[in-house]
Every structure is written in C-alpha cells, then in structure tokens.
Amino acid sequence: MDSSSSSSAAGLGAVDPQLQHFIEVETQKQRFQQLVHQMTELCWEKCMDKPGPKLDSRAEACFVNCVERFIDTSQFILNRLEQTQKSKPVFSESLSD
C-alpha cells in the first residue's frame, strides 16, 4: 500500500461533519413523519365515522382534540423518559457501591 492510499484509509474513520449533520436532519425528518403518520392513523380511526365531501363540526372538533392529546401525551412521555434517565445512576457507578 502506498502512502496516499494509507492516508485515505486512515481518514475513513472520521465522518464528514456535513454528512453527519445531513444524516441527523434526515433522521429527524423521518421521526417526524412517523409521528405524523401515527397521529393521522389514530385520529382518523377515532374521529372519522364516514368520509364525505365535507368535514362536519363534530369530526373537526374530534380531530383537533385528538391531535392536541397526541402531542400532550408524546411530550409527557418524553419528559418522563428524561426524568427517568436523569435519576438513574450510571451503570458502572452502581456496580462499585
């Protein structure tokens, strides 16, 4: 192996920051799309009795309430998970006690 190929091989371990940022953004987009899909499916099943040319006021109110509850519940779960992780001791620390 010559010096140019060995230096490029050594660089394979480093991730391009722009590529890493792009992947993070795309992953966030995917997660958001999954949440929207879950919310749409859940609220559609709950609120839509029979599809028609126009959304009636009862169904509209149901959709609004469903979306708000979905967001509230998702936020509650995220907050609870954060609290749980913060209160847990690090695994290696708990073994040393």
UniProtKB/Swiss-Prot annotation:
Keywords: Chaperone, Deafness, Disease variant, Disulfide bond, Dystonia, Membrane, Metal-binding, Mitochondrion, Mitochondrion inner membrane, Phosphoprotein, Protein transport, Translocation, Transport, Zinc. InterPro entries: Tim10-like (IPR004217), Tim10-like_dom_sf (IPR035427). A motif (Twin CX3C motif) lies at residues 43-66. GO terms for molecular function: identical protein binding; metal ion binding. The modification Phosphoserine is found at S57, S87, S94, S96. The twin CX3C motif contains 4 conserved Cys residues that form 2 disulfide bonds in the mitochondrial intermembrane space. However, during the transit of TIMM8A from cytoplasm into mitochondrion, the Cys residues probably coordinate zinc, thereby preventing folding and allowing its transfer across mitochondrial outer membrane. This is Mitochondrial import inner membrane translocase subunit Tim8 A. The lineage of its organism: Eukaryota, Metazoa, Chordata, Craniata, Vertebrata.
